[in-house]
Amino acid sequence: MEIMSLAIAVFAVIIGLVIGYVSISAKMKSSQEAAELMLLNAEQEATNLRGQAEREADLLVNEAKRESKSLKKEALLEAKEEARKYREEVDAEFKSERQELKQIESRLTERATSLDRKDDNLTSKEQTLEQKEQSISDRAKNLDAREEQLEEVERQKEAELERIGALSQAEARDIILAQTEENLTREIASRIREAEQEVKERSDKMAKDILVQAMQRIAGEYVAESTNSTVHLPDDTMKGRIIGREGRNIRTFESLTGVDVIIDDTPEVVTLSGFDPIRREIARMTMEMLLKDGRIHPARIEELVEKNRQEIDNKIREYGEAAAYEIGAPNLHPDLMKIMGRLQFRTSYGQNVLRHSIEVAKLAGIMASELGENAALARRAGFLHDIGKAIDHEVEGSHVEIGMELARKYKEPPVVVNTIASHHGDVEAESVIAVIVAAADALSAARPGARSESLESYIKRLHDLEEIANGFEGVQTSFALQAGREIRIMVNPGKIKDDKVTILAHKVRKKIENNLDYPGNIKVTVIRELRAVDYAK
């Protein structure tokens, strides 16, 4: 029983152990499955998180790459733009410097070529000068011998004509001289042209020597300021257009204006030289209008010169009116105002005559007021005292005589007429006002720096030079150029033939030598131009 009980107990224990083992095994298996499930879930979640993280990382990387590429492109574009701008600036600077260097090199080359050419010419002239002088001397002897032969022929013809025709000596001489002049006109003209051609090459050197000597002796600027006008050019290429083909433009300009055009190596500058201020002002206005317009040819030059002559005429009237109002004489005759306006372009010993007249008028008015005289009449007389100088180069007589005639013509008071007549002491002063004006004239002229004796003498010499040329038959007009070293004469082609041109130049030269005192040489140029104009309709 006890064994049975023990066996049962043992069996129960075994059963309990088996059941416990089974129970424990079941629990362990359940726990393991749960753990495995949790592990699978954890792994799945980890896999999901890793995938999401990888995707987010890929997105961030891609976005970062895009931003990096965009920034890189912007930086590259900015760098390229800056490089392009810098390269353009450098290229422009280099281009400007190259252009400037090219211009400088071109000028230097031209000057070197010109100097070489002048040096060659001077060398050639020096080598042939003695030979030409000897040739001229021989020809002069031949001409003398020929003249003797001609005189002998004339004597023979005189005797023959008197014997055959019973003519008087005077009649025979006239016939012979007429025949001789007609037969020898061509020969004389040819001889003169040959002689001029032989000494032409010497003239350039002599003119340069004279110019150098004058420059060394005189260093003042006054004459240049009084006789020169400067016109600025947009560029040096305009110099060639001003000269024109074969010099046509510059010759037309100089012949129409009577002003010398100086074109030298000075960059972008043309100088207009002439002693007549009105001509020089017309030339300056014409040149500036030609440069602005751009059309430079003889017809346009002629058109603008005529237009500017009319413009100057209007300015002259305005100057006269303004001066009359300034001195308190607004009731002056309009023609007298215009004549007085011309004095704006007239100088006396370097002093502007219109300003001098205004100055005399004001001084005379002040002195008349102090003395109890008619101040308005004194100003009027002082203003008109030099009116004759406005046209003394056009009308015969002194400026005093011309002024008296003008005052009488326009019915000025007798006091004014006597003041004009007596202000240089030519006649006796008949009023206190005449004495006052003479004193005011002396005060204005004696003011330090007011006048220059040399300029007046210079201008008078140029006027005399033109008067000599204009005195010959067939001469239309003449212009003194190159500071009086050249006289250019325009002749009527209907009265002066080609064969007579050289003879006219020779006669003018002889008369200048006999009547004028002048330094150096004077070139006489006679121009005969035949122009035909028609209109197509």
UniProtKB/Swiss-Prot annotation:
Subcellular localization, as worded in the UniProt entry: Cell membrane
HD domain sequence ranges: 353-446
Molecular function via GO: RNA binding; RNA endonuclease activity
EC number, UniProt record: 3.1.-.-
Transmembrane segments: 3-23
InterPro entries in the record: HD/PDEase_dom, HD_domain, HDIG_dom, KH_dom, KH_dom_type_1, KH_dom_type_1_sf, Ribonuclease_Y, RNase_Y_N
Annotated region described as Disordered, given as residue ranges: 114-144
Any one biological process term the GO annotation gives: mRNA catabolic process
Enzyme class label: hydrolase
GO cellular component: plasma membrane
Keywords associated with the record: Cell membrane, Endonuclease, Hydrolase, Membrane, Nuclease, RNA-binding, Transmembrane, Transmembrane helix
UniProt key word Nucleus: no
Topology with respect to the bilayer: Single-pass membrane protein
UniProt domain KH: residue ranges: 227-290
Function: Endoribonuclease that initiates mRNA decay.
Family to which this protein belongs: Belongs to the RNase Y family.
PANTHER family: RIBONUCLEASE Y (PTHR12826:SF15)
NCBIfam families, per database record: HDIG, PRK00106.1, RNase_Y
Name the record gives this protein: Ribonuclease Y
Organism in which the protein naturally occurs: Streptococcus pneumoniae serotype 2 (strain D39 / NCTC 7466)
Gene it is expressed from: rny
